[in-house]
C-alpha cells in the first residue's frame, strides 16, 4: 500500500512535498546540469485539487452537527456525553471537528482509525470520584500509515477480531532547559493489554519502555474505511485523481520553465565573426558586413498554447472525475434530478464513507462507555448530502402557498429546513409553540371578536377536510381507470 500512498502524500504535502520528490516526478533531463535542474524544481508549484475534493466530501458528510440520541425510546442523553463531545482529545477538539479530520484521512488513504485511550492512573472507586479527578476517555486519531502490522491467532476464524495491532508513533520529549527531541516508538495493542517499545542500545534493540492493562476485553481501536479491500487494507478512492494532480503539476512546471527560458529572446547575428564579447545598449552599435544580418529569435507561441490547453484539459478531467467518484455520477450529461438523487445513492462514496464513519464513531462511544461503566448514546450522522439553499424568491413562493392554504404549516417549515433557511429547526416544537401563541392571542381579543376568529378557523379546517376528500376521490378514480385499462 505504500506505493499507492506516495501520490497521496505528495498531494497532501503540496508544493514542498512535490519538490522533495523531484527525483521521481521531475527527473533530471539528459545533458541538464545540476544547477539548471534545481532552478527548474524551484519554479514548480502544486495545486491542491485532490485535498480540496477530500475536504469538500468531508464537509458534505458532516455539514450538519453529529447528533447523540438515547438508545431508549423517549429517553434523554446523559449530560456526561454532551460534555465529552465538546473536547474529545483533551485539546479542545469537538467531535464534529475530530470526525471531519478522520473522514478526510479515510478518504485520502482508504482507511483511518481511532484509538480510545484512558489516563494511566489508579482506578477510581466510582464514577463520581472519577469525574472529580477529571478522568475520562479521550480519542487519538491514527492514520493508515501508522498501522505497521497486525496479527490474528492461527486457529482463529476469518470473522474473528484481530488480537494484536502495532502502531508507529512519534512523540516529542523535553531535552535540556529549552529544547525538545522527537522520539520514535512502537505501540503494541492487545485485548486488555498495551506496550510501548523504544530503541535501546545497539545490543538491546527494541525494549519495552512502558506497559499496562486496560479494562476492555477488545483492542480499543475503531477503523473506518472508504475503499476497503480486506481487514486493515484498502485502496485510496482518490488515487486516480491524485495521479492526474501530479501530471498537472508536471505539465505546469514544464510550462513555467519554458516561459522562463523564452521570456528573453535570443540575439542572432549573421556575418559577424569578430571574436570577443558583444555589448548591447542604447549607445552601442554592431558593424556588420553588407551580407550580414541581425535579429532576435523567440519560440512560437503555438507551443505554449498547446501546453496550456493540455493543462486545462487535465483540470477538467480532475473536476469530472471528482464528481463521478464522490457521487457515483456518469461522466456524461445528466439531468438536475438525477444528479440530486445520486448524491444520496447508497453506492456513492459519500454514502459509503458516511455509513462507515457513523459505525466507527458508534464503536468509539461504546468503548468509551465501557471504560466508565455507562450506557453509550446512539451516534447519528445526517445522510442528506443534497445541499440546495433556497433563494429569496423561492422562500416567498412557499410563503404564498402557505398563506393561500395550498400547503400546511409543517410542510412550509420542512421546506425551509431542507433549503437551509432554518437548518436546525425543531418542526414539531415550532408548530406547538405557534399554536400556543395563537391561543394566547385569542384570549387577548375582545369577546365579541373571538367568535369570528373561531368561525374562520373552523372554516379553514373544513376547507382542508374537503381538499383531502377531493384528493381521495381523485385517487380512487385514477385507480379505477388503471383497472379498466388493465
Place the predicted regions along the sequence by residue.
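Surface-exposed assembly/interface segments
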Residues: 1-29, 155-179, 183, 311
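Extended, helix-rich architectural segments
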Residues: 1-139, 474-486
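Conserved aromatic-histidine-acidic binding/catalytic patches
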Residues: 33-41, 46, 102, 302, ...
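Short secondary-structure junctions and interdomain/linker hinges
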Residues: 60, 64, 68, 91-98, ...
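Short amphipathic alpha-helical segments
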Residues: 80, 90, 94-99, 106, ...
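Extended, regular secondary-structure scaffolds
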Residues: 106-228
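Extended, charged amphipathic alpha-helical segments
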Residues: 203-340
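C-terminal helix-loop subdomains that flank or include functional centers
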Residues: 285-287, 306, 313-486
